[in-house]
């Protein structure tokens, strides 16, 4: 009888908890932008899986708790926030987990315009902020870490052009050039205010501050920073140093990277021949100089051989890509002495009937994967690659000519998953709930 009373008491307690959750954390409906339905808001940090921070030791990443090496197989889905669909974001993160992927790079910004996160300088949409909360919360539930980018060089979703427009509207004296983003005090203050709002945000689901959230792998200062005028290069370099130091002043838990494409500047003249063309040296980007900044923890590189070399044969693109990757691996290991991530690796999906895009993409991806795996075996600087970009059904409006629904491309799906397997077998790190099903 006493055992039955205890059982009834336990059942009553569980029922009470259920009523409290349904009362205080009701289903919240999708904010629009791509379907999705609703989701239940459960701010219970003790339900989150334990996850250590990612850290850096010399030229490679480590588990901050154990010191074990971390090598990344990841992907880009920039649209997780702008889609404003928790259901689609959750599905993408689940699919990433099924492939053994460990890091997703996505945008943590949406500046101005309809449905923006930052409506105007320092003014935010709480509803959109809660979408970002959910993305981070759901990433941790799936043992995925996020690289969160803080602003765009491009005009997409606002970018630095929106900051310039805001400053001009406020009466700031400046030219129309978006290069003002890197040097004008008003714009730099806007950016710092935004960074502070993001880093000090307390997640409405987990109640964990972003700066204390281990599911965040790193902060990226800008997506593909470039200048209009080559004379603005020193301003970009100073901006990187200032903003990296500012991020670190607010958050010592997380890694910081610039977000560069990896183009070489005039600092080391013999490297200019590694660029895809003379045009690349005129964009102010200088891979070595930008990445050498004290508070930058790792270098970033992009790889788009098809769009960078549109007239080249596949054989020429393969040869170029191999040299591009090798050069950045060697410079990161020997000069920078920092890890390097190939944070975007993409190949155009041609629509013509004679195109062999999937096969060509797999060839390009395999080159990068093999070089990363070889680096991982040697505990060297090549620390991972992230395909651009993965989608799920219902996100076509956020796609581009590089987008892939992986399960619709069996060869690509297998290639991505096999890379996850290879890296897991080396050091056994990553999602403890994911086991490779591909025989060695």
From Swiss-Prot:
InterPro entries: Glyco_hydro_5, Glycoside_hydrolase_SF, MAN-like. One of its GO terms (molecular function) is mannan endo-1,4-beta-mannosidase activity. It catalyses: Random hydrolysis of (1->4)-beta-D-mannosidic linkages in mannans, galactomannans and glucomannans. Substrate binds at residues 107, 223, 304, 388. It is found in: Secreted. The keyword Hydrolase applies. Expressed in stems and leaves, and at lower levels in roots and seeds. Glycans are attached at residues 173, 176, 230, 330, 356, 401, 418. Its EC number is 3.2.1.78. Keywords: Glycoprotein, Glycosidase, Hydrolase, Secreted, Signal. Pfam families: Cellulase. GO terms for biological process: polysaccharide catabolic process. The keyword rRNA-binding does not apply. Residues 1-22 form the signal peptide. The active site is at 224 (proton donor), 344 (nucleophile). One of its GO terms (cellular component) is extracellular region. Belongs to the glycosyl hydrolase 5 (cellulase A) family. This is Mannan endo-1,4-beta-mannosidase 6.
């Amino acid at each position: 009888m006493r055992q039955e009373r205890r059982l009834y008491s336990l059942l009553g307690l569980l029922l009470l908890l259920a009523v409290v959750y349904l009362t205080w954390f009701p289903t919240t409906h999708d904010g629009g932008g791509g379907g999705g339905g609703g989701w239940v808001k459960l701010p219970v940090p003790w339900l989150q899986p334990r996850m250590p921070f990612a850290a850096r030791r010399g030229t490679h990443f480590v588990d901050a708790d154990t010191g074990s090496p971390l090598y990344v197989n990841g992907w880009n889905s920039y649209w997780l926030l702008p889609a404003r669909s928790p259901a689609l974001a959750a599905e993408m993160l689940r699919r990433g987990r099924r492939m053994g992927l460990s890091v997703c790079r996505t945008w943590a910004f949406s500046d101005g315009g309809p449905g923006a996160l930052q409506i105007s300088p320092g003014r935010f949409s709480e509803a959109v902020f809660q979408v970002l909360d959910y993305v981070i919360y759901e990433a941790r539930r799936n043992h995925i870490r996020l690289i969160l980018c803080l602003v765009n060089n491009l005009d997409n979703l606002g970018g630095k052009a929106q900051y310039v427009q805001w400053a001009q509207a406020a009466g700031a004296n400046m030219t129309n050039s978006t290069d003002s983003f890197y040097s004008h005090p008003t714009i730099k203050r806007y950016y710092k205010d935004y960074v502070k709002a993001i880093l000090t945000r307390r997640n409405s689901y987990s109640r964990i501050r972003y700066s204390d959230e281990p599911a965040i792998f790193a902060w990226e200062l800008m997506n593909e920073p470039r200048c209009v005028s080559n004379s603005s290069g020193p301003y970009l370099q100073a901006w990187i140093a200032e903003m990296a130091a500012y991020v670190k002043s607010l958050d010592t838990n997380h890694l910081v990277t610039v977000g560069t494409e990896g183009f070489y500047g005039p600092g080391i003249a013999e490297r200019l021949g590694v660029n895809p063309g003379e045009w690349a040296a005129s964009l102010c980007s200088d891979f070595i100089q930008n990445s050498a900044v004290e508070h930058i923890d790792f270098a970033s590189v992009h790889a788009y051989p098809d769009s960078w070399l549109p007239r080249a044969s596949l054989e020429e693109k393969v040869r170029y890509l191999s040299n591009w990757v090798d050069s950045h691996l060697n410079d990161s290991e020997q000069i920078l002495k920092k890890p390097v991530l190939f944070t975007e690796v993409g190949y155009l999906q041609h629509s013509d009937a004679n195109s062999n895009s999937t096969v060509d993409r797999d060839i390009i991806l395999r080159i990068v994967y093999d070089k990363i795996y070889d680096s991982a075996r040697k505990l060297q600087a090549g620390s991972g690659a992230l395909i651009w970009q993965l989608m799920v059904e219902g996100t076509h409006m956020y796609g581009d000519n590089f987008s892939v629904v992986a399960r619709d491309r069996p060869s690509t799906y297998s290639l991505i998953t096999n890379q996850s397997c290879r890296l897991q077998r080396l050091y056994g790190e990553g999602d403890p709930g994911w086991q490779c099903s591909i025989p060695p």
